[in-house]
């Protein structure tokens, strides 16, 4: 099996690409890879919903920290890899309906990123296998094939190239979901990945790790866009109570205060223009603990 031949670097890259790709398998535009359904043509009968989905997914991925960044922040906290935090691959057999399979595909994708970031190669192989198993049950098992892996390895130093690779993969997924009217699947995958990512981050955060606390606080933005995305599928049976669950988490994030700073420009060592801004973020220990408890409760509902 090809996964046995991968180095931990390759697995880490596959984890990143996998999360991005599976998040893309339902709705969007071909303009950007972060547009969730670029693979799927725009539904002209619902132009407003299509536009909302594209915008929501774009914003979600703009505010989610990369696996590499999150791993660095977790490591700086002094935390060690904890396999017990991940959703056991033994649970995969329990997931028999579309909602369970899609949400936990996102969960396993986040766990795969977590394991590979800590160079846990054997764990990474297990979780890659679990993710592919759920993808097969959902009918999107060809999303990560050997050609994609080779392209990822060839372009591993260029994030822009990786993004383009996922954009190209959009087209391969069009038939899987559009023809069977399952566009909501991708939204559930994104939700699962978001839930697990926040769960892992809050499980490692400490009172003195300000950077990790800030990144957790900033998920206030991605959660808003995630809810906007899910709202476009309101009434679709497969979603169940996930919108209400996300809004319950959002209520706690209302206590997070983020004041945007002045936008500044600079150049990196290669002379490229860099644009950024510094924000003032306020999140109390009480709010952080409440978010941690809530995300754990919600997450446990979906992995059991």
Regions from the PLM with identified roles:
Residues 25-33:
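Bacterial lipoprotein signal-peptidase II cleavage site
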Residues 20-24:
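C-terminal motif of bacterial Sec signal peptides marking the signal peptidase cleavage site
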Residues 125-130, 149-150, 188-189, 213-217, ...:
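Short, charged, amphipathic alpha-helical segments
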Residues 2-12:
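Bacterial N-terminal signal peptides that target proteins for export
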Residues 28, 234-304:
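A cross-kingdom marker for long, charged
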Residues 112-119, 138, 142, 176-180, ...:
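Secondary-structure edge/capping motif, primarily at the C-terminal ends of alpha-helices
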Residues 34-151:
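N-terminal Sec/ER secretory leader and immediately downstream segment
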